[in-house]
């Protein structure tokens, strides 16, 4: 598995021109976000290149965009011998597609967790609750033979 850097200042750089294109400052974007995304935290997130997936979705929403992501298949991996029991109840749908990507390659949560030095239940917790850092999403995708790809899509104009 390739090493994924938690601090990758380039990871979130693509959103900076989008924020400015909407005439927003980092402080103004923070004011438009829900209270969990504090104003001073946005420059920090961009500087370190990491944030929670849910925070990324909230920042996109506040700037008038939609946060979208997918995993691109980049290499085969050994399927697991275990029964793949999917996560079936979700507190957040944000990471729900991860289960579909894992099922395509017949990868169980315990085996994915083992590749990352975590338990299957820790991976299941991330997916079920939608609590995952962007860097953790990259690591999970890489361990499963995928590449994590994300973007902010423009929302259609409301007439």
Task: Locate predicted features.
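Acidic (E/D-rich), amphipathic helical modules within compact regulatory domains
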Residues: 43-44, 49, 55, 59, ...
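Core residues of bacterial helix-turn-helix
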Residues: 22, 33-36, 63, 105, ...
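Residue-level signal for the short linker/turn that defines the boundary of a DNA-recognition helix
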Residues: 24, 51-54, 107, 132-135
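DNA major-groove recognition helix of helix-turn-helix/homeodomain DNA-binding modules
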Residues: 54-69, 135-151
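Short alpha-helical "recognition helix" segments of helix-turn-helix
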Residues: 28-33, 108-113
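The DNA-contacting recognition helix of HTH DNA-binding domains
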Residues: 26, 37-40, 67, 109, ...
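A short, Lys/Arg-rich alpha-helix, primarily the initiator
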Residues: 1-24, 68-70, 75-106, 149-151
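Recognition helix of helix-turn-helix/homeodomain-like DNA-binding domains
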Residues: 34-51, 117-132
